[in-house]
């Protein structure tokens, strides 16, 4: 049990499928593979499932067609047509657990970095959700479980043509004021260090180089000579 998510002790997702298969074998469940379902027809208290290989009759039906995620495996969206024909209302089909493509030319320079942080998602200026964990930075934007957790809110907002902004905080365990005090004390103890040297050990070097560049503070300037505003600029870049 990790943060409310259940995993096999082996950390192998295939173990879940294997367990299901073994239980199906124990119960003598009949499995039809490579069989396309064309229609589900309710008849009295039963269902007739029309397939490309003939009809199957059942007392109960669970429709788990996999949306449009993997057409090569059969998840091509045809399940929606089947459900609609049975009278179900179909809501807009949107991505639910995906990475986020972001604007910005700097992502190339930090691609491949994995870093602990918090992602907050804003829709039309209001924070609608946030999640914390390992964030993966890619050539196109951001990924990782925290990003997946907020992505459905982004997909819905973008579908509704709303403005979406993802804010990353790479020191979520401290408030802005606490982090400013922490860096000020660190600068007092290491006054001759440059920003890149000063932040070494706290963050990935690719991230440090990006923050220093964005701060427009000379990368050769000793942190002991930083003004309060320059220090706060670094804090805001790291936390916002």
Regions found by a protein language model. Name each.
Residues 1-60:
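Feature captures the FAD/FMN-dependent oxidoreductase FAD-binding
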Residues 2-21, 86, 90-110:
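Rossmann-like dinucleotide-binding cores of NAD(P)H-dependent redox enzymes
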Residues 31-33, 63, 90-93:
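General beta-strand structural signal in soluble alpha/beta enzymes
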Residues 37-38, 55-74, 83-84, 135-138:
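Short hydrophobic core segments
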Residues 89-92, 98-222:
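An anion/pyrophosphate-binding glycine-rich loop and adjacent beta-alpha core
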């Amino acid at each position: 049990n990790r943060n409310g998510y259940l995993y096999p002790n082996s950390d192998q997702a295939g173990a879940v499928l294997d367990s299901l298969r073994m239980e199906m074998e124990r119960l003598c469940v009949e499995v039809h593979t490579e069989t396309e379902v064309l229609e589900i027809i309710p008849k009295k208290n039963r269902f007739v499932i029309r397939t490309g290989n003939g009809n199957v009759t059942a007392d109960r039906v669970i429709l788990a067609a996999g949306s449009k995620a993997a057409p090569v495996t059969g998840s091509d969206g045809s399940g929606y047509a089947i459900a609609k024909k049975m009278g179900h209302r179909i809501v807009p089909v949107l991505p639910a657990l995906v990475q986020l493509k972001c604007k910005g030319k700097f992502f190339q320079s930090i691609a491949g970095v994995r870093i602990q942080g918090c992602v907050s998602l804003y829709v039309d200026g209001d924070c609608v959700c946030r999640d914390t964990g390992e964030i993966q930075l890619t050539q196109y934007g951001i990924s990782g479980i925290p990003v997946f957790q907020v992505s459905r809110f982004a997909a819905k907002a973008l579908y509704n043509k709303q403005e979406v902004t993802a804010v990353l905080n790479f020191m979520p365990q401290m408030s802005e004021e606490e982090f400013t005090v922490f860096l000020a004390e660190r600068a007092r103890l290491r006054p001759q260090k440059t920003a890149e040297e000063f932040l070494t050990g706290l963050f990935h070097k690719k991230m440090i180089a990006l923050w220093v560049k964005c701060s427009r503070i000379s990368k050769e300037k000793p942190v002991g000579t930083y003004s309060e505003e320059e220090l706060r600029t670094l804090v805001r870049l790291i936390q916002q």
